[in-house]
Amino acid sequence: MIYTIIKPFIRIALSFFCRKIYIQHRNNLQLKGPILIVANHPNSFLDAIIIGAFFKKPIHFLARGDAFKKNHHRFFLRLLNMIPIYRLSEGKENLHLNEYAFNQSQKILENGGIVLIFIEGICLLTNQLQPFKKGAARIVLDYQGKTDLKVLPIGIAYDRFNAWAKTVQMVLGKPIDSKSLVPFQERAKNMIFFNNQIRQELEPLIIQPEPANIQPNIWVYFISSIGFYLHLPLFKIINQFAKAKTKNTVFYDSVLFGLLFILYPLFLLIIGMILNALSALWGFIILCFIIIAARTIVLCRNPIK
């Protein structure tokens, strides 16, 4: 329920966080389940946020288990349809919890849902494809639903990491009949074949984007300059907090986006209340200008250094 409600707002927020998001083969965003989305994983939770925001149907995401350690993190992530899955590096004692993740994935798929798994099983803040884990192949091999399962490869890439106003390239591949990816009797042989085939499908979909070549006119640049200084105190505070919380991790972009998603509406609410107390009409006009200026900042400059 919460996921469905906030998804449109996430799409709006992405337009203030990313300079441009290019999507190829958009028609596949309308596909219905059961679908296992297999994607690369260059930028932590932001990958899932972007893919989920543009898909028409709800998506459930398999996400790294160490992000679920704190109760409030666990609560929030589960509201976003995220399911924890653990790697050996996150503690051998947690590996038994993966049975829950795979069982949940099977239930979702057997009920005609969509599950997203990042087949590399690791995020290194790079568009370079990493070695594959066996989780995606396991889900396909264990699937027992009545409706044929499709596997949809998606490549996602960024022009920069740990930075604002990024350009994103997302390319959706062709849906593949899962049975064609596991044609053998031996489970181990099927896993190797599955990963090899998916790599062949996924590699061409990862296209390094160039920074969006947007050349605003002088008025847009002027508005962005005003907006830059209007937002600078908020941006500085959020930036410093995000850096402190994500030091030596890959979560900076995800945490920065999450903070802005929550705090920027509060910022606008406070400014709006102050302006409304002074003049309702002019307060509304100025508030609209502030919102427009925020978008022009993304087009013209990087407000966080």
Name these PLM-found stretches:
Residues T4-I10, L14-I176, S225, N239-K305:
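Soluble catalytic domains of membrane acyltransferases
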Residues T167, F193, Q197, N217, ...:
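Generic recognition of short, well-ordered alpha-helical interface segments
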Residues V168-P175, S180-N190:
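Long hydrophobic alpha-helical segments that form multi-pass transmembrane helix bundles
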Residues I176-S180, Q215-V220:
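Extracytoplasmic/lumenal ectodomains and periplasmic regions of secretory and membrane proteins
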Residues F184-P204, A212:
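Long, charge-rich alpha-helical interaction segments
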Residues Q200-I214, I237-A242:
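Juxtamembrane amphipathic/hinge helix adjacent to a transmembrane helix
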Residues P216-A244:
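Core alpha-helical transmembrane segments of integral membrane proteins
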